[in-house]
């Protein structure tokens, strides 16, 4: 039935602006593992370093620290990159102004990671950053929780605070993102096996294996260094990450190198290796020679984006596959 009367007699504004807490609560529980949120934070750091790899003033280092707080874990990701020039854009949902590589091109990763670690009303996170302009002014900038959007009296805009000095940042420029993750959520990094140990040390080991696997190509083929610092009981232990790569059965591995191809999103260079791998018993998750850790492994510029027994019917990628 059509409405024949097209002349309204009145109108009113619909007030449907989201609140920051409502947004975080809505997007905060979509990951199966806290490791996915950790990788979102690492993606931003690596993206910045790769996009500015020709800058001799940068430190090509990403340090991830995990501190045992008992009922929670403090996660901190520090890089020696350029710093974040526009924190407003970085904290705006779907804003792509700061996109530098495919690792941070969608404008959701930082917010999604923070919300996934802690979307509670008393969320705790902070972003400290220092650009070359900040360093010249002998200052750093900081934004702290909660996440707000300035949409109501109860949801006031976030503020950037300027402080003198370097704010504990270990490099001339760079960014430190710190977020509290409840221990129950951090324990999701544990493999889904009854025998898998769940004490803090082993949880950090699972995260290390995840990082070594996800960023194997980055660690093997770029000058970026990644470290994990494990903090528990007042002691610190530093782990320098090495790429986690398969051990091939002799004579089975084949290569297809430097194959140009356009899958519909632009020209790519495809590198492919395939064959039989030997199980690595020391691994908790990857390259164990079982069904779960076998199948297809897909990487973009060295970063794993898919693995396991999957099939692809359509794939559009805008960048180089390594």
Go through the PLM ranges and name each one.
Residues 1-61, 66, 86-91:
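Bergerat-fold GHKL ATPase/HATPase_c domain
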Residues 78-100:
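Glycine-rich/acidic phosphate-handling loop/turn and adjacent ATP-lid/helix
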Residues 100-232:
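GHKL-type ATPase core
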């Amino acid at each position: 039935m059509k409405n024949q009367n097209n002349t309204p007699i009145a109108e009113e504004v619909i007030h449907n602006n989201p609140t920051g807490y409502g947004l975080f609560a809505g997007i905060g529980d979509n990951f199966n593992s806290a490791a996915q949120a950790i990788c979102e934070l690492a993606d931003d750091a690596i993206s910045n370093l790769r996009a500015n790899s020709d800058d001799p003033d940068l430190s090509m280092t990403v340090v991830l620290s995990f501190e045992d707080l008992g009922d929670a874990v403090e996660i901190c990701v520090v890089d020696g990159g350029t710093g974040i020039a526009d924190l407003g854009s970085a904290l705006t949902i779907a804003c792509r102004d700061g996109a530098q590589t495919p690792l941070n091109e969608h404008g959701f990763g930082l917010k999604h990671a923070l919300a996934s670690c802690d979307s509670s009303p008393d969320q705790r996170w902070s972003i400290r950053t220092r650009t070359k302009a900040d360093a010249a002014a002998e200052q750093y900038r900081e934004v702290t929780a909660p996440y707000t959007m300035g949409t109501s009296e109860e949801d006031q805009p976030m503020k950037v605070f300027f402080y003198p000095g370097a704010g504990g940042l270990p490099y001339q420029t760079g960014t430190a993102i710190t977020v509290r993750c409840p221990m129950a959520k951090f324990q999701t990094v544990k493999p889904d096996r009854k025998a898998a140990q769940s004490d803090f040390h082993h949880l950090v080991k699972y995260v290390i294996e995840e990082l070594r696997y996800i960023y194997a190509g980055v660690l093997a083929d770029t000058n970026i260094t990644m470290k994990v610092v494990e903090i528990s009981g007042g002691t610190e232990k530093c782990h320098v990450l090495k790429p986690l790569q398969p051990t091939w059965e002799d004579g089975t591995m084949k290569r297809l190198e430097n194959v140009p191809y356009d899958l519909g999103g632009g020209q790519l260079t495809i590198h492919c290796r395939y064959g039989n791998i030997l199980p690595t018993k020391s691994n908790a998750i990857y390259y164990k020679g079982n069904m779960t850790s076998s199948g297809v492994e897909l990487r973009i510029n060295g970063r794993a984006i898919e693995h396991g027994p999957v099939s692809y019917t359509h794939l559009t990628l805008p960048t180089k596959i390594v």
